[in-house]
Amino acid sequence: MPYSTFPLLWVLGLLALSSACYIQNCPRGGKRSFPDLPRQCMSCGPGDRGRCFGPNICCGEGMGCYMGSPEAAGCVEENYLPSPCEAGGRVCGSEGSCAASGVCCDSESCVLDPDCLEDSKRQSPSEQNAALMGGLAGDLLRILHATSRGRPQ
């Protein structure tokens, strides 16, 4: 056997052995065949009392929601984890879940939602509206309403 074919056979043998190792390690159906099991989203906010709902959204009962603030900054790390997470809470809106009392969030934004009130079954619709209009959202609506009344139509 000439010496020029010996290196070629050696390289082919090495290639056959190394590719066999990769094939043995793969599960049936390929490396992505196992479904990703959902896990709890990362903790965030003051005292880690909230959960990440998106890369810039941190919400929790009793603390409300932080969007784009330093409290929600750690939620960006959720994008770099290989498996998906579930923030928890009841399903609301189109693809969201209840994040705090009266607030429904998905990975992009949050909206006020009466279905997310804690005692929504025991409250009348007028009480639900009053609860949603409390706090910062209610203050903003009152300011907008007051400024629109001052303008001539």
UniProtKB/Swiss-Prot annotation:
Keyword Ribosomal protein annotated: no
Coiled coil: none
Record PTM Glycine amide, positions in chain: 29
PTM summary: Seven disulfide bonds are present in neurophysin.
First and last residue of the signal peptide: 1-20
Localization terms from the record: Secreted
Family membership: Belongs to the vasopressin/oxytocin family.
Role noted for this protein: Vasotocin is an antidiuretic hormone.
PANTHER family xref list: NEUROPHYSIN, VASOPRESSIN-NEUROPHYSIN 2-COPEPTIN PRECURSOR
Name of the protein this chain belongs to: Vasotocin-neurophysin VT 1
Species in which this protein is naturally found: Oncorhynchus keta
Lineage of the organism: Eukaryota, Metazoa, Chordata, Craniata, Vertebrata
